């Protein structure tokens, strides 16, 4: 069984001392490729994921500004993102979007930076990775007006209605460890109705470890539990989930 972790954060301090061992465990679990998300701790640290991807052949990267860091953006930020995106290991743009849960940046600033990054990603012809938390209606309104192209709704935690809205926009939906939580019945209902060709899996490491590791530092090898739960929800085998999600990821990023 070969799997792709479509969203992880391997560049931060939580993996500073044992990343080689983490990636060895991922390989042993069948995780053959990983997409590490290049938001860092905001500008000017978005290059950290690219540096990780350059070190490991199985790791690829994105670049972008997380909505938490929208207030740190300067005009130079967009030039830096454009330059980093020229690296052949960069295969996506994100994670970008809106986060009204923490409001680390003013909402108007978040929206402006989101729109500008959509323009940049469109020009670069890169798929986008969307982060949205307690901001779905504003997120989807902006996408309807400013985006036409492929993308991933990362860490899908919505219900079936939100899933349909994302699918109608042409997005793929990525499910992570939350799918295994006892409180996630609505997420599992949504996961059951996503078409085969729009389904992805992810970890969002080091966050949101699946049961039985909930509350621990997450790592890519743990994704097998999410895959097992997703297979159970959809009435198929884990091998089927692995095959379709790997194919979908490769199609999405043009590889």
Identify the meaning behind each predicted range.
Residues 1-255:
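Mid-domain alpha/beta scaffold segments of enzyme catalytic cores
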